[in-house]
Amino acid sequence: MTNSDITAAYYGVDPVSKIYLGGELVWPTTPPPVYSAIPLTFKILSAGTIMWRQNGGSTSTTKTIQYKKNDDAWVSITSSPTVSVAPTISVQPGDIVQFKGTNIRYNNGSSQNIFSGTCSFNAYGNILSLIYGDNYLNETELPSGNTSTKNFSGLFKQNMGIIDASNIIMPQNTTWYCYEEMFYYCGNLVKAPTLPAATLVYAAYQQMFDNCKKLNYVKCLATNISATDCTSSWLNQVAATGTFVKHPNMTSWPSGKDGIPRNWTVIDATV
């Protein structure tokens, strides 16, 4: 019998509301979150700001998204290439900020639309809420077509506030440059999202975690990394030691910044 088998408990004829084993609550238990059913979310760890800004380019390539802080209503914001007028969200520790949008890509070649700011946070939830808006629940892949490139390129570029991204749910496929520089120079990032895509296309992960100097955990289930530049410098200048979890059938990872960092422990995933 497991905790989930318990539907009710009694002490004599009196109902029991909680059961402890020592000091640990063993019933009722809270089921783990289903991160795929949650929009992209930041759990705030320190007071500060979240800024939605454009890095380079002109106002013609800005992007509009929506955010919700705690139980407030959804609010639309549009990125700006001018930092002084870029939308800014003030946050405190414990705040929950969620995001959604309907943009196929957040990098137009000449510009990147990025999250920056001064707060520290953990990120989790379904990244596809930024592409499919309210309809992300039934989607598991990036859109196809010629305009579906650079989807999340540079999205967290140089964001020093993001600490743990391991519970961001990523798509099952890749597109050209889809995650190029996505976490570039995120100097305090420790854990990367699980990367489920089997086949990497041209430049898909190029410089994805370049100069994430504290990054020490990566789980990548790719089995085909033959495309040009698909992992070029993707793990350049990360932590000196760490853990790399790979697909058990994948035996062709190179060693170094374009593959598995030297001196990292390699583990086969359970698939």
Where are these regions (language model features)?
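Tryptophan-centered short beta-strand motifs
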Residues: 3, 74-76, 189, 264
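Short proline/glycine-enriched turn/loop motifs at strand-loop junctions of beta-rich domains
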Residues: 45, 55-63, 239
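Noncatalytic modules at the cell exterior or secretory-pathway interfaces
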Residues: 48-52, 87-105
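Periodically patterned hydrophobic/aromatic "hotspot" residues that form packing/interaction faces
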Residues: 6-10, 19, 152, 156, ...
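Enriched but not universal
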Residues: 1-53, 266-271
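Short beta-strand segments and strand-loop junctions that repeat across beta-rich extracellular domains
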Residues: 53, 62-76, 98, 248-261
